[in-house]
Amino acid sequence: MKVAIVTKINCKSCINIARIIISALPSDWDIIYEKSLARAIKKPGLEINEINADIIIVIGGDGTILRTAQFAHGNILGINVGGLGFLSEIEIGNIEASILKLIRNEYTIIEYMGLDVYVNGVYSGKAINDAVIHTDKVSKIRKFRLYENNYFIETTSADGVIVATPIGSTSYSFSAGGPILMPNLNGIVVSYIAPVGFRSRSIVFSEKTDLKIAIVGERSLLTIDGQIEKKLSKNDVVNIRVSENGARFISMYTNFYEKLREKLIKDVVN
């Protein structure tokens, strides 16, 4: 079994957790380390885009997990250090019990849908959570023209537009008033950030949709999973479609609703 360990950059507590995990893993497992962690523990390491493993243990927040999903190859197991950590499966208090489950193969592997993003026909990256087109200046709105399979839908004035996967529908899109999609639904959610007027609501498209968003007016920014950023100019066109390959995550929850209750709706009485 080949296991890679990735930690949030400049996170001392993450390094301490990594040491605990390293000591708990079977001695016959092959462990590789992402370079920033490797430097801290004085081990040989790999750049994140060089990592290819059976399991990738990621210690940090959702940003670290998305960075790993963007560049590394393997089944991702997230350990939450800090924030909400919706993409994580393990909290700090149950690390040892969860690693024991990992060793015993007491988990499932879920593949989350991804989105391929193109700007003017040139591939720009893959989104596991979302692709966001937003204004490049505070308090400035932009116009976005939306098409499905080259059929014009609407032109909307807003601070931005979010195109989310099912797992990404629990993130920025949800905060913007969008619906939550179950991970097995394979739909695409389009939500606007602070739209002008009451008509602009979230739209759910099928996985066969080729979305096109044309930038009307001034410059904007494209952000993919918060990891890749690209400047957009007037009349630039962003195409987004479902990727052939998403990202594989290790799950230790009984079902998605259990995770939803724990991470997003903690006030619900069970």
Swiss-Prot record:
GO CC annotation terms, alphabetical: cytoplasm
A Gene Ontology molecular function term of the record: metal ion binding
Active site (UniProt): 62
Cofactors (names): a divalent metal cation
GO process terms (BP): NAD metabolic process; NADP biosynthetic process
Binding site for NAD(+): 62-63, 67, 129-130, 140, 159, 167, 170-175, 194, 227
The protein's role, per its UniProt record: Involved in the regulation of the intracellular balance of NAD and NADP, and is a key enzyme in the biosynthesis of NADP. Catalyzes specifically the phosphorylation on 2'-hydroxyl of the adenosine moiety of NAD to yield NADP.
Similarity section: Belongs to the NAD kinase family.
Protein name (database record): NAD kinase
Organism of provenance: Picrophilus torridus (strain ATCC 700027 / DSM 9790 / JCM 10055 / NBRC 100828 / KAW 2/3)
